[in-house]
Amino acid sequence: HASYRRQRQMCIRDSPNTDYAYFMKGLAAFSKEKELLSSLPVLGDMTHKRDLSSAKVSFNELTEFITRFPESSYVEEAKSRMLFLRNLIAKQEIEIAEFYIKRKSYIAAVSRADYIISNLPNSPFVKEALEIKVEAYDLMEKKELKIQAEEILNKFIRASKE
């Protein structure tokens, strides 16, 4: 079995179309996400009501593809799709965090905001995530944490203007 696995890995690695196979693997999950999106009349605030696990799978598969095949001719297309997926996932996390704020589940809201800040740092929703943290800490009456979150938010805003 071990020699079979080694040979299989060598064949996969040496195949001239391996990059395409990995790219298509990422697109398969992306296609599922596009189908879900096209079935909704207007995306609007509906993101939080949908399961975006296929978007996350696609994002991870495309990340692996780019890591393994940085010189592939499909990299730019993969990056474009990842940008769309990243923003879709971040938007959902913001909507869920806002839902938690309304439900007074402040720790859960902070957790969702932290996910965006840590895992999707280049998304356009980072500022909103930081604002949610400030609001949640304020509502929990956690003065020190609120001050820290405000400082980070202010640094982020200043850095964004540069």
What are the roles of these predicted feature ranges?
Residues 1-12:
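Single conserved hydrophobic/aromatic residue that forms the stacking wall/gate
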